[in-house]
């Protein structure tokens, strides 16, 4: 090969050849050499090398790091491309099997090679005493585990908690091992809330605790619910305890609104809420003034419930009549209300013709719209100069709107111009002369006489007006002393026949203290020893009352027919013969 000087090369005319030659000269030392040897994770060169460039084919020997062992030829070679070529020739050493962990387990994450960890854990209910991990590491010329096997010991709990108003089934022990269970119970009349049993468990794999929390014993009372128109199953009890159940039923005519079964809850309340019994028909019988219910087998009650479509018939009380001619019926309608009744109106009696009669006394009910209504009565006399009446001077307004007896018309008497005679039918003159009369207005031009009545003798009572004699048509009121009851009318009037009407009442003691003062059979049952005696006594008493009533009627008929004519005189009174 001919050597060329650089000057000569520049002078050549072959520029292309020059460029190729120059590149070859410059690249010759780079393409064939290897750089410094690589730093391997498992091995390093046997000796320290100072060279930074190695020719192709150069071989370097390596030695394995601690914890690794040689598995193949431990050298690297520089190839023609200037790269170090090698295969993995060192492998990690392996620690021995750690063995078996009693009541636990060992978790090998990947292998037992150097640098790797294993983990320890205990079985449920056991606590780990020692390290939870161990690492395979180099120790001297070999490898071993960084930590020895731990120990798994069974967990323990303190004695179970004591609760108020209750107890548990555990024995008197200082410690309870994992899995131990105790059962709680409450004292009588107390209810257990929570879990009755608790168990010794482990928390965070470090400590033994009782789980769940112990229960509590409380006294829970639910009061007996009050459900109008409802019935309870089971029957009546003042109190109910937790979780007691009640079934509610409604009485006939009422429908249940709500749940039929309720339970006593921990807060002392019923759940669901207590239902109600609502009417399933019409209630509250219509209040029809002056009417009574008719055609019903049993007395009607406001508390009864009537089904839809029920018809009730009513009738007006004596002295009243229907406002209209409609049927006197009310009906229970679909909306659970009664149809509107037509009602009753008062029956009125006509006002007496006052032209020739004079009303001297009356009893009237001034609260109504009638001048005279059913039950009212009047006392009357004929005006002066007219015929005397043929009745007893008293008439009552009846339920049909008529007076009974009918009020007569008094006719003028032409024979009585300047006087009128005094006569008593069916009474002898001798008897007449023995009667007492009162001369009215003795000094007047026209004088009249009136019959007088003697003072009534009321034992244990008093009169509204105290006098020895009372004039005809004069009213008095009788009132009994304290502790006595009035038998008869409290108001009486003096009639022209010198008798009191109605009969003079009397006062009797309110209640007998013993059998000696029993009045007319009152408290008779206390005085007789057998029912037969009582029956006979009542029959005798009834018979005596009938006799007394007949005598009074006979006396009344006799007094009614005693009528008198009075003589107009100019001086002292004298009866005509």
UniProtKB/Swiss-Prot annotation:
A Gene Ontology BP annotation from the UniProt entry: negative regulation of complement activation, classical pathway
Signal sequence interval, chain numbering: 1-32
Subcellular localization(s) per the UniProt record: Cytoplasmic vesicle, Secretory vesicle, Acrosome lumen
Keyword Kinase among record annotations: no
Domain Sushi span(s) in chain numbering: 33-92, 93-154, 155-219, 220-279, 280-346, 347-412, 451-509
Glycan-bearing residues: 72, 81, 144, 195, 204, 335, 426, 431, 434, 443, 462, 475, 497
Role played: Binds to ZP3 glycoprotein in egg zona pellucida. Probably involved in interactions between sperm acrosome and egg zona pellucida during and immediately following the acrosome reaction.
Descriptive protein name: Zona pellucida sperm-binding protein 3 receptor
Record organism: Rattus norvegicus
Lineage of producing organism: Eukaryota, Metazoa, Chordata, Craniata, Vertebrata
Gene label: Zp3r
